[in-house]
């Protein structure tokens, strides 16, 4: 897919795991209504979770979500979304759950499976999808964080590749869907007046602040296992840093853009303890507390020249 044009990929069903979770409540349901409103969604939308719900309860959850986080229920789009919604209840480790999903998919040949679930469940769900014949012709969208560490990320990658080809795997960061983040590439590379000055000779440092006005209510278990760095820094904020500092890609395809982002990340030396401050690290179970992190990064060889750190970046994340 061309990231700069955001060309859509056609699927004939959308399955999202974690239908009763926080990401679905805050992001997915409002996005689904927006897609219906724009005419971009007219296929079955199947929510999967372990809560003992039915279709009507899923629709009610979608309504509450959109009223709270989506700017209100659209009188035309929401009824159409309601007709598309289906619900499959069951344990992700139970093959019967995925057999029920296979039956609910019906004649769908190109389903898209969106894993809006905790990372430790990714492998289980992918393997169960394969065993139930739900991966044939399918695409799998994996949310961040991708693994808990390097070893688990490699293991997850291996499992995905054992049942899907690379073109069918989408490792996504929903933060990149924010208009300001996505438009940064246009802002930089289309602006012929600005880009010549976007280098270490004109920019001494830049600061990125991610300030959130909500805590971790309802997500204590996830946050205790994940933490600020895995939740928002090594994905959300590093993507923003990459967009800010990457060189113009040779082509506007996803691989060329990815390659330039990788160059930025490789140019950042390992963090030194003196450049990192984390709050609440000594509390045994700060479930009701905000997490906070600030760090100073050095970006070596920015702008194509030699020499040392040309820029610095800081990121703070709270609540997640």
What are these regions, as identified by a protein language model?
Residues 1-141, 146-283, 287, 296:
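Secretory/organelle targeting and membrane-embedding segments
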Residues 147, 304-305:
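Short amphipathic alpha-helical "recognition" segments used for binding
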Residues 281-289, 293, 305-320:
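Conserved small/polar residues in nucleotide/adenosyl-binding loops
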């Amino acid at each position: 897919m061309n990231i700069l044009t955001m060309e859509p990929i056609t699927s004939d069903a959308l399955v999202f795991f974690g239908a009763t979770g926080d990401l679905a409540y805050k992001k997915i349901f409002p996005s689904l209504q927006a897609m219906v409103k724009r005419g971009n969604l007219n296929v079955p939308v199947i929510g999967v979770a372990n809560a003992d719900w039915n279709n009507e309860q899923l629709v009610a959850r979608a309504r509450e979500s959109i009223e709270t986080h989506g700017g209100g229920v659209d009188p035309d789009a929401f009824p159409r979304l309601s007709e598309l919604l289906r619900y499959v209840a069951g344990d992700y480790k139970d093959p019967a759950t995925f057999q029920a999903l296979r039956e609910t998919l019906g004649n769908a040949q190109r389903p898209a499976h969106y894993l809006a679930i905790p990372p430790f469940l990714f492998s289980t769900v992918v393997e169960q999808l394969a065993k139930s014949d739900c991966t044939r012709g399918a695409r799998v969208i994996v949310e961040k964080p991708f693994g808990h560490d390097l070893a688990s990320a490699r293991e997850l990658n291996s499992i995905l590749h054992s049942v899907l080809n690379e073109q069918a795997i989408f490792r996504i960061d929903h933060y990149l869907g924010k208009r300001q983040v996505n438009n940064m590439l246009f802002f930089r590379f289309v602006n012929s007046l600005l880009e010549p000055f976007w280098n270490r000779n004109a920019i001494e440092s830049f600061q990125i602040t991610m300030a959130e006005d909500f805590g971790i209510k309802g997500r204590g278990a996830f946050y205790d296992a994940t933490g600020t760095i895995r939740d928002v820094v090594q994905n959300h904020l590093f993507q923003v840093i990459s967009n800010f500092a990457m060189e113009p890609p040779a082509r506007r395809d996803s691989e060329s853009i990815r390659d330039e982002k990788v160059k930025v990340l490789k140019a950042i030396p390992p963090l030194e303890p003196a450049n990192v401050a984390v709050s609440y690290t000594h509390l045994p179970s700060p479930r009701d507390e905000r997490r906070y992190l600030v760090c100073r990064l050095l970006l070596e060889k920015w702008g194509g020249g030699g020499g040392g750190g040309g820029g610095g970046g800081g990121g703070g994340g709270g609540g997640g």
